[in-house]
Amino acid sequence: MKTRSGIQVVDSLASIPASDWDALAGNHPLLSHAFLHALHESGCASAETGWTPCYLTLWRDSRLAAAMPLYLKSHSYGEYVFDWAWADAYQRHGLRYYPKLLNAVPFTPVTGPRLLATNEADRRALLDAALEFARDTGVSSLHCLFPVAPEVAAFESAGLMLRASVQFHWRNEGFSDFEDFLARMNHDKRKKIRQERRKVRDAGIEFRWLRGGEATQADWRFFVECYNRTYRAHHSSPYLNLDFFLRLARAMPEHLLLILGYRQGLPVASAFNIIGDETLYGRYWGTKEFHSGLHFETCYYQAIEFCIAEKMDSFEGGAQGEHKLSRGLLPQRTVSAHWLAHPEFAEAVTRFLRKEASGIENYVDELSEHSPFKQADHAPE
């Protein structure tokens, strides 16, 4: 058997043992072999949908030493860091922006490792190889979305431009229950949340928390129906399908939480969450009926109650959404890193990002002035 060594581009995780990949990914379910492979095998992240997998791997004596989730993209959908204006500018100047390379977890605005390695030298080797691959393939750009803080310096030192954005996260301050959480908030916000929750209860809606192994195929079918409704209500096409969720339910049930709302014994709303070591990741929701406050209850309040009950450190409620602030989710800075092959465009984007970063700082400062908590020590991170 031929020994695998050096940098290799792999088009499917089927050729990599799950245990080897997961040893590098650590305890990050959204970076796990099962999660990424399910995206590909279900057809959600594939060449047909504009997500051609080209995982960058580093091998020593046929053992996987480092890896980088990498995709050749023919569009900018499903990224949650918006570069549509850059693509438009390229087009106006007669230049091609697509294809581009994307180092990220598809459809997932969650911060996590992007250079999967056990030492700094291998991380740098991956990044150097990614830049070389970008130049060799002639793509317009390389984008690394939502890396962890230790990787940011490596991206910057390699010449990538950094871009800031903001999400809203909930932190568990050792709350004993939901009422203890509410007690830390100012009167108006506390009153509003209680009113929202009361409206849902008065509508006769009750909730169940189902771990992945407890949810039936009927539960998953109902959730996907709700998920599809949410996207279509916004005149968008759903990114994910039932096959993907069923694959996750089989491969990693311990990391899945399905929140289901019932009225008169029948399901009416649902939310899909990923359970990490210390963090709950809120991903998707939907409903068959409109009830005042149902969105906030299903997506946020039930998730917060789960985190308190399970003594989890935090809840990440997804991208954007200033409405989350008044529900106890505070602003959290996130970062992406970008390399553009065209020097003049790279210079123009650098200037743009400087101005944008200043605006982001002002935005975070403004949000912090409207914290829902009584204490003054809930500063943004």
What are these language model-derived features?
Residues M1-E381:
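N-acyltransferase acceptor-side catalytic subdomain
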